[in-house]
């Protein structure tokens, strides 16, 4: 009886939208957040049908991440839907393109050219069984294997030129009266989604949610806000014709994590982060030379890139720095005590200027 080798079925590659690639963790569709360091702790990018929550403190650093998120979407021909905010003026404040190319693209290109081919591959080949010699060598996908054009670098000192072909929409404000204050917001979103072509990537941006500047007092009540979050979460996860992702910021100084609104928001969210700024002291030419605060991870949609567990505590203490060109997240280390060292140096170099104690009784 003869046996025939069973060949693997050939599967046609799926056509991904622009700015979307497969995750190396579970092959989900992910897209860039606009910040390469933020993408690293998101295991390459934001998964589709995700709701990200950023809890901001007294400083408005969370708006930088939201602007990077929206600017990246416009550069990738994605559709932007802006929640209750200052309106179309918000799009004029988006960061523009940076003159410096992205580090990821440079590193990928350098890695491809810096490793020359081996002169004698027969000497370096591992001696294994003959039946395994023809097996193709596969490389595990890493975060460095980023396709060109997946992410862009932006400059906060410049403004993005919003072209006529860029599609975006602005939501109206919630009502101050009525049984459902968020009815015009949901109607605006569903009407906008119905006009999009199937397969479009739509990014939802909700800056300073629950802020009294954009939301009425009635809209901040738990019974209305929880209903709105449930409706928004179901739209993000159940809409099949359009790929939705949402990023919102919440002022933690007005609504703590213990209140009912934030409790349900974190439970329904795919990822939760919080920013805790430091008091800024040292600056050089108007630029901050130290981390601006702590960046804490409370919840993640995927496991961390350096572990196989979806445990946010594995990241350790992180800090963030906002410069002219990027929002950087890196491990936080306590700085040296420069003030005490300067005082000791001054006292050693200038002994005459030290105050002389009186010895008279």
UniProtKB/Swiss-Prot annotation:
Q: In which pathway does it act?
A: tRNA modification; 5-methoxycarbonylmethyl-2-thiouridine-tRNA biosynthesis
Return the InterPro entries for the record. Answer: Elongator_complex_protein_4, P-loop_NTPase
Disulfide cross-links: none
Where located? Cytoplasm; Nucleus
Task: Cite the record's Polar residues compositional bias ranges.
Answer: 104-121, 346-355
* GO biological process assignments: regulation of cytoplasmic translational fidelity; tRNA wobble base 5-methoxycarbonylmethyl-2-thiouridinylation; tRNA wobble uridine modification
- The answer, when asked if Cytoplasm is one of the entry's keywords, is yes
Q: Where is this region: Disordered?
A: 93-124, 338-361
Has UniProt tagged this entry with the keyword Lipid biosynthesis?
Answer: no
Q: Which domain of life is it from?
A: Eukaryota
Which Gene Ontology CC terms are recorded? cytoplasm; cytosol; elongator holoenzyme complex; nucleus; transcription elongation factor complex
Q: Give the protein family.
A: Belongs to the ELP4 family.
- Assembly and oligomerization: Component of the elongator complex.
Q: What does this protein do?
A: Component of the elongator complex, a multiprotein complex which is required for multiple tRNA modifications, including mcm5U (5-methoxycarbonylmethyl uridine), mcm5s2U (5-methoxycarbonylmethyl-2-thiouridine), and ncm5U (5-carbamoylmethyl uridine). The elongator complex catalyzes formation of carboxymethyluridine in the wobble base at position 34 in tRNAs.
* Name listed for the protein in its UniProt record: Elongator complex protein 4
Question: What gene is this protein a product of?
Answer: elp4
């Amino acid at each position: 009886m003869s046996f025939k080798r069973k060949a693997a079925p050939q599967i046609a590659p799926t056509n991904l939208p622009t700015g979307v690639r497969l995750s190396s963790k579970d092959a989900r569709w992910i897209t860039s957040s606009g910040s390469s360091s933020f993408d690293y702790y998101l295991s390459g990018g934001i998964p589709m049908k995700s709701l990200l929550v950023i809890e901001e403190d007294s400083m408005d650093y969370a708006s930088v991440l939201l602007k990077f998120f929206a600017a990246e979407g416009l550069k990738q021909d994605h559709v932007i839907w802006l929640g209750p905010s200052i309106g179309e003026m918000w799009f004029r404040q988006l960061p523009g393109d940076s003159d410096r190319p992205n580090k990821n693209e440079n590193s990928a290109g350098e890695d491809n050219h810096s490793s020359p081919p081996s002169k004698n591959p027969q000497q370096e080949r591992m001696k294994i069984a003959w039946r395994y010699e023809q097996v193709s060598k596969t490389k595990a996908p890493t975060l460095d294997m980023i396709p060109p054009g997946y992410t862009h670098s932006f400059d906060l000192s410049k403004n993005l030129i919003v072209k006529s072909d860029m599609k975006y929409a602005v939501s109206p404000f919630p009502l101050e009266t009525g049984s459902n204050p968020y009815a015009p917001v949901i109607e605006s979103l569903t009407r906008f989604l119905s006009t999009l072509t199937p397969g479009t990537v739509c990014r939802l941006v909700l800056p300073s949610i629950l802020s009294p500047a954009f939301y009425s007092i009635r809209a901040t009540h738990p019974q209305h806000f929880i209903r709105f979050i449930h409706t928004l979460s179901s739209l993000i996860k159940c809409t099949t014709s359009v790929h939705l992702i949402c990023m919102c910021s919440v002022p933690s100084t007005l609504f703590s994590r213990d209140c009912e609104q934030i409790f349900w928001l974190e439970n329904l969210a795919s990822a939760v982060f919080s920013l805790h700024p430091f008091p800024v002291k040292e600056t050089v030419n108007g630029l901050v030379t130290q981390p601006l605060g702590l960046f804490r991870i409370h919840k993640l949609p995927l496991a961390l890139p350096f572990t196989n567990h979806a445990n946010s505590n594995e990241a350790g203490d992180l800090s963030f720095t906002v410069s002219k060109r990027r929002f950087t997240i890196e491990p936080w280390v306590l700085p040296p005590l420069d003030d005490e060292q300067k005082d000791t140096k001054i006292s050693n170099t200038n002994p005459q200027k030290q105050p002389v104690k009186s010895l008279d009784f």
